[in-house]
A protein has these predicted regions:
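Conserved histidines in hydrophobic membrane contexts and catalytic metal-binding motifs
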Residues: 53, 70-96, 110-162
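Short, non-transmembrane alpha-helical segments in secretory-pathway proteins
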Residues: 32-65, 100-132
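N-terminal Lys/Arg-rich, disordered targeting/topogenic segments
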Residues: 1-10
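Hydrophobic membrane-insertion alpha-helices, especially the h-region
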Residues: 15-33
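Acidic/histidine-rich, surface-exposed loop or edge segments in extracytoplasmic proteins
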Residues: 29, 33, 92-99
Length: 162
């Protein structure tokens, strides 16, 4: 009788362990699938932006591709053309209007970062090239604040906080 009770107890423990393992696998797979679904639009935007920039502007090498979301949304592509000139290409997400800027004709990312820090930015999270009120800008993200620095003059255009 004791043998039967021990066998039933072991069987119950085995079933419990199997059930917990299956539950863990299902929850982990669901989480990974949701992460994959969340990243898909961003990856699609990056590849589409890079492809359009190479197709219409002669961009040969894309170094940085981002999605800029300001008053309007743009694919922001930084790279080099065949003459190895550094370019910034902005492609309107909705209308696919293309703007091309030579990076040597404005301030650098480092200068935009320095201007933002002068105006109170802490640790810099991300710098994205964009367009605000028909002017090219560097968008510097620091914590919950966004500093918009004019690409041509280096002046702070706007500071936005979340």
């Amino acid at each position: 009788m004791k043998k039967r009770q021990n066998k039933a107890k072991n069987n119950l423990l085995w079933q419990y362990g199997l059930g917990m393992t299956i539950l863990f696998v299902v929850i982990s797979a669901s989480f990974l699938y949701l992460v994959f679904l969340g990243m898909k639009p961003y990856q699609t935007a990056k590849s589409e932006g890079e492809k359009l920039a190479q197709q219409y502007t002669g961009l040969e090498q894309a170094d940085q591709v981002d999605l800029y979301n300001g008053l309007e949304s743009y694919y922001s592509v930084l790279g080099r053309n065949k003459q190895q000139e550094a370019l910034a290409v902005l492609i309107g997400k909705d209308d696919h209007k293309i703007y091309v800027y030579q990076l040597n004709q404005g301030i650098s990312q480092e200068k935009a970062e320095a201007v933002s820090k002068e105006k109170g930015a802490g640790e810099i999270d991300k710098i994205t090239f964009g367009r605000y009120q028909d002017k090219p800008i560097w968008e510097v993200k620091s914590g919950t604040n966004f500093y918009l620095v004019d690409f041509e003059t280096g002046a702070l255009v706007n500071k936005e906080g979340l």
